[in-house]
Regions:
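Non-membrane alpha-helical secondary structure
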Residues: 1, 6-7, 312, 332
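Secretory targeting and sorting signals
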Residues: 2-24
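N-terminal secretory/targeting leader peptides
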Residues: 21-125, 153-363
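Short, solvent-exposed loop/beta-turn-alpha elements that line the ligand-binding surface or hinge
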Residues: 126-149
């Protein structure tokens, strides 16, 4: 694949409670054909909206709230899965090449917005109740304010799934098991630092590149959530999931081109804002509800779930301490970390995910 926009184009014309396909032509200055709907073009790195249910929910809500008068045209596979694809989405929105975009919060610490790195602090946000508490705090709005330096306007931070270590030959438990391995991940300063701190080498590889690198043995594991692990057909290539190690959650950040937002009417902007707020509010319950069924599917496909011992967990945290030291060098990021740590102290983690009988590693 070559860098740049992929040809896959999906138009989501969402009206009332249904979605339909449409195309736009001959737009006026508000972005719509005379008398027709406003069409907003959205860059997205995956192959389709189903890869990020909270983002798909935002798109659906825009259609419902606007009665179909605002449509979001999703341009999938933006960046063709190259390591810098998510950064390309941000830049495309900033320059007005597209109107809207979304990217994982992980990428922004590589683009001069370090505050989002607190969301990727390893093994900090390790439960869905805590992730939900973070979203319901002041943190998202404070983090989104930093996006102005990238010439985009933040709309919302959406919760997404917890990501685990997944490996080819054996479960990744204590740091000694990580030593010398190459681990697939996404472009992220914090996440790449964490993998190095555990003794492994980070390799930015996702989409078809992850599959290719697994087949060639270039990577021996990766960080991913169980839902995508099943959906992307990766179980046969890497069977071992460490169930009780949540490295970090994925957060999906929605943003818009400021000039394009200004060209909309006040009502159209309000629909976008309401859709973003609603999607953020329900994002964690949406993805958390898929976790149990995904574990069962993975088990049926041959995955095996391992449990790190208390000693393993302590060793992991000790190795990862250097990542926190680096995060705390930025005053704002340090403040964000302290707020998340306080939320963690006051938020019960909820029950551990149930692992089906016969699905534990070694069985």
């Amino acid at each position: 694949m070559k860098p740049g926009k992929a040809g896959a184009l999906l138009t989501l014309a969402l009206v009332a409670a249904a979605a339909g396909c449409s195309a736009s032509a001959g737009a006026d200055k508000a972005g719509s054909p005379a008398g027709g709907p406003v069409v907003l073009r959205m860059a997205s790195t995956p192959s389709g909206p189903s890869d990020a249910p909270p983002v798909a929910d935002f798109i659906r809500r825009v259609g419902v709230l606007s009665g179909g008068s605002v449509q979001i045209q999703v341009i999938n596979q933006w960046g063709d899965y190259v390591p810098g694809a998510e950064a390309q989405v941000v830049r495309a929105v900033g320059t007005g090449q597209v109107d809207l975009g979304w990217a994982g919060s992980r990428v922004f610490d590589t683009m001069g917005v370090p505050g989002f790195g607190a969301l990727s602090a390893p093994m900090l946000i390790d439960s869905y109740p805590l992730e939900n508490a973070v979203l319901n705090s002041s943190l998202p709005s404070r983090m989104l304010a930093g996006l102005s330096r990238l010439h985009v306007t933040g709309l919302a931070v959406l919760g997404d799934v917890l990501r685990h270590p997944i490996a080819v030959r054996r479960p990744l438990l204590a740091p000694v098991g990580w030593l010398g391995l190459s681990i697939g991940t996404y472009r992220s300063g914090v996440q790449e630092q964490a993998i190095r701190a555990l003794g492994a080498g980070p390799v930015v590889a996702f989409g078809p590149y992850r599959t290719h690198d697994l087949a060639r043995g270039t990577i021996q594991g990766f960080e991913l959530d169980v839902q995508r692990y099943v959906h992307l057909g990766l179980v046969a290539s890497a069977r071992y999931v460490t169930a009780n190690v949540a490295l970090w959650p994925q957060f999906d950040v929605l943003f818009a081109n400021p000039a394009r937002l200004a060209s909309l009417t006040a009502q159209q902007r309000a629909w976008l804002e309401q859709a973003a707020a609603g999607a953020a509010r329900t994002s964690v319950p949406l993805v958390a509800g898929q976790n149990g069924p995904s574990i069962k599917q993975a088990c049926a496909m041959g995955a095996r779930f391992a449990t790190a011992t208390p000693a393993d967990l302590a060793a992991l945290r000790q190795s990862l301490a250097v990542v926190y030291q680096n995060l705390e060098t930025d005053p704002q990021t340090s403040a964000f970390l302290r707020q998340i740590q306080e939320l963690k102290r006051t938020t019960p983690p909820g029950p551990a995910p149930a692992i089906p009988a016969g699905c534990a590693a070694g069985q």
